[in-house]
Amino acid sequence: MASVTSLSDSVQQHLASALTATRPEAAGADPLLRRSDRADYQANGILALAKKTKANPRELAAEVVARITTGDELIEDVEVSGPGFLNITVADRAITANLAARLADGERLGVPLKQDAGTTVVDYAQPNVAKEMHVGHLRSAVIGDALRSMLDFTGEKTIGRHHIGDWGTQFGMLIQYLFEHPGELAPAGDIDGEQAMSNLNRVYKASRAVFDTDEEFKERARRRVVALQSGDKETLDLWQQFVDESKVYFYSVFEKLDMEIRDEEIVGESAYNDGMPETARLLEEMGVAVRSEGALVVFFDEIRGKDDQPVPLIVQKADGGFGYAASDLTAIRNRVQDLHATTLLYVVDVRQSLHFRMVFETARRAGWLGDEVTAHNMGYGTVLGADGKPFKTRAGETVRLEDLLDEAVQRAAEVVREKARDLTEDEIQERAAQVGIGAVKYADLSTSPNRDYKFDLDQMVSLNGDTSVYLQYAYARIQSILRKAGEVRPAAHPELALHEAERALGLHLDAFGPTVFEAAAEYAPHKLAAYLYQLASLYTTFYDKCPVLKAETPEQVENRLFLCDLTARTLHRGMALLGIRTPERL
């Protein structure tokens, strides 16, 4: 792997050197370089430096320009603009040579690995045992999966944790019913995901009906909770059946979502049972938690309720039971002390923000989250229906995730079939899954995670606008051009002058690495999605204005094929980081 310095970084280094040469006391000053509509880049840092040194900004800018060599391999021209801005134009040769180095690097496209890589534990995709996954589970899974891929690509080590809901009082009801009705759940290995969920739903509804009408059964169910929590083998065996059958279902849904879930990363609430008493004991001994009305709680002066009373975090209830806080705090101890995490990232509903704020502060007070560990709650918004309210079925029920994905694939099949020229029905169905699932993911990921968004399948599978289908068709179009080129191979020709559309495309291709790093560092997959949409848009402009196979000279044909090839590889790599497929033909 040979990392490639981006053009923006190279220009930044040149400007920093010129600033230091002009004003030695300004060593280390930031030129504040950014992309510009007036030139390739604009530097605004001279204004702050002029103010600091009490110099005239335009005169200082002119001095800096005099220190910059233009017409060389990198910078073609520099102009002073406005009150003291620098407008910088990069040489065509530099753009092509830089992109050629990226293409030669293979899959990483010249993007370096971060030097200060740590270990991030990503807590995402947390369904509940014995319950169907619904539209509310979509965002945690899709966002978490994309963030892991992006962090991995930068060089960070990531460990996934699926904190599934596999513990609680509801299992007393379920297990007692199964104990009294043996054989209701088939062995997990004998069924598929749909059958597993059907069985679990049947048992849940039947047990709930008995629980709500039979007081004696209700009492037996409560005793079963005690048996479960005390580790009774017979009870645990039946509980394990529910967990195993639920996993079969989970895997089927995640497979449909085109996500890899590793069994060893499914670590539910139950995994922390043994550690929760110690967590409570340590918090009480340290004085972080105190007894209040029989419960063990943590108070926060700055967090108050409507009556201006402190809102407590309940670690242990008055009856001795443990809640979510004890489980989450025990998980933090495990992830920091045993997994050696330097960052804890939670991809959870924004409505849990207060809970995690209190959990993190408690862990800080206890010393379990030291200065060397960062904990971040990336709360996400709600998926809305067309009416702007939380997405429901027409009957007012929560939308099943499987139904939503199936409909997306079905709608995508209509789009693919309409555009298909030489695809068989099997190929259409294969592409439909890639397009439909990609459309659902992209609609989510192209939205800032903390914002709500409307689930609109018509827009999601549209060929126009900011959709994954638009990106996929751009990729497929490039593959078609490369096939039509036959024996003519892509080749970079730095000696050629570039068309304006070629320059715009080339400069954007060069920004792939910095964009991925920024999106990963800010946990902002929507920034990568926006980059890819702009890339496809710039390619469309290039395609319209710059004939590829009918270019004026053989060298120009090769150079434009080279730009096509690198664009396709960048689209493929970027969309893969978002968990979206790029079909070669559509």
Curated annotation (Swiss-Prot):
Aminoacyl-tRNA synthetase found in the keyword field: yes
Protein name: Arginine--tRNA ligase
Assembly description: Monomer.
Superkingdom of the organism of origin: Bacteria
Primary location: cytoplasm
InterPro entries, per database record: aa-tRNA-synth_I_CS, Arg-tRNA-ligase, Arg-tRNA-synth_N, Arg-tRNA-synth_N_sf, ArgRS_core, DALR_anticod-bd, Rossmann-like_a/b/a_fold, tRNAsynth_Ia_anticodon-bd
GO biological process, any: arginyl-tRNA aminoacylation
Location relative to the cell: Cytoplasm
Family: Belongs to the class-I aminoacyl-tRNA synthetase family.
SUPFAM superfamilies (UniProt xref): Anticodon-binding domain of a subclass of class I aminoacyl-tRNA synthetases, Arginyl-tRNA synthetase (ArgRS), N-terminal 'additional' domain, Nucleotidylyl transferase
Single Gene Ontology MF annotation: ATP binding
Reaction catalysed by this enzyme: tRNA(Arg) + L-arginine + ATP = L-arginyl-tRNA(Arg) + AMP + diphosphate
One GO cellular component, as annotated: cytoplasm
EC assignment: 6.1.1.19
UniProt organism field: Streptomyces coelicolor (strain ATCC BAA-471 / A3(2) / M145)
Keywords assigned: Aminoacyl-tRNA synthetase, ATP-binding, Cytoplasm, Ligase, Nucleotide-binding, Protein biosynthesis
Keyword RNA-binding: no
Motif ('HIGH' region): 127-137
